[in-house]
Amino acid sequence: MFRRFLAVFLTLGVILFAGWMTLRRDDIPYEQLEAIYANTDSRYLAFGDNMRVHFRDVGPRDAEAIILVHGFSASLHTWEPWVDNLKRDYRVISIDLPGHGLSRCIDNAQIGPAQFIETINRVANTLEIERFTLAGNSMGGAAAWNYALAFPQRLDGLVLVDAAGWPRTETESEDRPLVFRLLEVDLARRVMKDLDLSSLIRGGLEDSFGNPGFVTDEMVERYASLARAPCHREALLELVSGQGETRREATPELLSGITAPTLVMHGERDNLIPYQHGEQFAAAIPGAQLILYPGVGHLPQEEIAELSAGDLRAFLTTRVYGVREEALQAIAPE
C-alpha cells in the first residue's frame, strides 16, 4: 500500500514538475525588448544604482509640457493614443516607471511611490522643464496625486485617470480580476513568478476594458514580454504583495492640500478601481472637475482615446493654460 501511494505521489510530482518546466519562461534581455518596443522618440536617462529610465519626448519644445505616467504592469505604450492627439500643440513626455516597460529597477531599493516621484522629477529636471501638467492612470494616478502634494510649485495641472489610492472595501477586493487576487497569495506568487502568464494577462486585460474585444494578441504579447525584462517580475510581485515601499492611502484631509487645478476621469465599468473612488477624489480635491464615462473600463486613454483626449484638451484650455494666460495679461504693464 505504501509503495503504491509513493508511486502515485512521485508520478504526480513528476507531472507537476514537467508542467512547471513547460510553462517556465526566462527573462528577456533589455536589448531584445528595446529592438521591438522602443522607437525613434525613445530616450534613456541613467542615474545611480544602475537605474536607466525609458521615456519619450515629443511635440514642440517651447510648448506647455504634459508628463504621463502609466499604471501597474503597464508601460508608456498605454498613452500612445493621447500622445498622437496632443503632440501637435503640447510637449508630451511619457515615462516607463521603474520595473516597468523598458526601464530598469533601482538596486537595493524598495519600489513604490517615492521611486516614482523621484523618477518624474529626474526626467523633468533633465529636460529642464520647470512646470508641467501631470497625468497618471491607476498606480500612476497615485504617484501623480502624491507628487502634487510633494511638489505643488511644479504643477500647472493634475489629471487623475482611474487613479488608485483609496482603501478598498472587502467587497471591492473580492470583485477584482482573478490575476490580481492570485498575486496576493504568497505561494501563488512564488509558483507564478517564472511561468508564462499570457492567459492570465489576457483575462486581466479583458477585465480592464468595458469592451473586452478591445484586447489584441499584440497587446497581450507586449504586456507579457515587458514583464519578463530582468528584475521586472520581482518588482511587480513586490508591488502587488505590499512588500515594497509603504504606500499612504488617500484621505479627504490629505487630498485637501492639493492646489493644482485637477481633472478626475473614471470609467464607470472599471473592474479594478470602482468609479466611486473617482467621485471620492473629486469631492476631496478642492475645485476638482469630474468626468465619468458610462460603459468604459479602467483605461479611458485607450478605450475612448479621442473623447478622453478631447476632454483633457478642454480642461487644459479652460482650467489650466487659458486661465494662466489671462492672469498674465491682466498683470502685464500697458
Task: Please provide the spans of the model-predicted regions.
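Active-site loop/oxyanion-hole signature of alpha/beta-hydrolase fold enzymes
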Residues: 48-49, 56-58, 94-139, 310
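Conserved HGGG/HGGXW glycine-rich cap/lid loop of the alpha/beta-hydrolase fold
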Residues: 58-102
